[in-house]
Amino acid sequence: EKFNIESHLFPVHQHNEHEGAEKVLTYLAEGKRVALVTDAGTPAVSDPGTKVVADVREHGYRVIPIPGASASVTAVSAAGMAPEGFTFHGFLNGGKKERAAELQKLINSGRIFILYEAPHRLEKLIDELSEAVPADRKITIARELTKKFEQIDSLYSPDLHEWLSHNPPKGEYVIVVDAASASTEETLTEEDRQWIDELIPLLPAGQLSSIASKISRFPKKIIYNYIVSKKNSQATVD
């Protein structure tokens, strides 16, 4: 009212976030822009919004975070991960063994964790994450947050090297690694498995899971886990 801004408002809270996410996706499909705001705290960090952000990103829409108290909080708000808290670690230091031990400790903590990295060391960190992070953990890589060339990408460890080949290191990085996923009873239908199996040899796991999620309506993580499991079983047989 103070700035005479007129727009349609609707509430999103812990009891209706699924419906709220669907409404947001409907508006985006119509070519509209949507702002997720709170009267206190940061959306998807201190307040509800994780489901909305995750669904919007899964459907290929861009999420632009408003500058927060720090780069870590800003990155988490745009990552669309679970809101149960996170561990900020910053830069991994020390030699190869010390870094590997510290990274494994973070992975085993059961919490989302945040790393910082400089461009000239990014390739080294990508190597370490590719080797250590389980294939079903989402990794969000953000660079140049709140600046002109801001970039936020979410992927999984098997796709990190391919991502790096298309994104030469530039700017300062915030890396958010998801916690271990809870077990789920959702499984793909036999029909979906059949056509996904046909495409597994032709497309990277991340790209295929993104496409299949839009077609089948199953979460990308479930499809990605199926693809990785299928590839591993085929490798064992071979």
What is each model feature region?
Residues 32-33, 112, 119-238:
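A contiguous loop/helix-start segment that scaffolds small-molecule binding in enzyme catalytic cores
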Residues 1-8, 77-81, 87, 95-96, ...:
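RNA substrate-binding interface of SAM-dependent RNA methyltransferases
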Residues 51-109:
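Class I SAM-dependent methyltransferase SAM-binding "motif I" and its flanking Rossmann-like core
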Residues 6-13, 63, 84-90, 136-141, ...:
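Short hydrophobic/aromatic-enriched beta-strand-loop microsegments
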Residues 65-68, 115, 141:
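General beta-strand structural signal in soluble alpha/beta enzymes
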Residues 11-17, 69, 90-95, 144-146:
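Short, acidic/turn-prone active-site loops that include or flank metal/cofactor-
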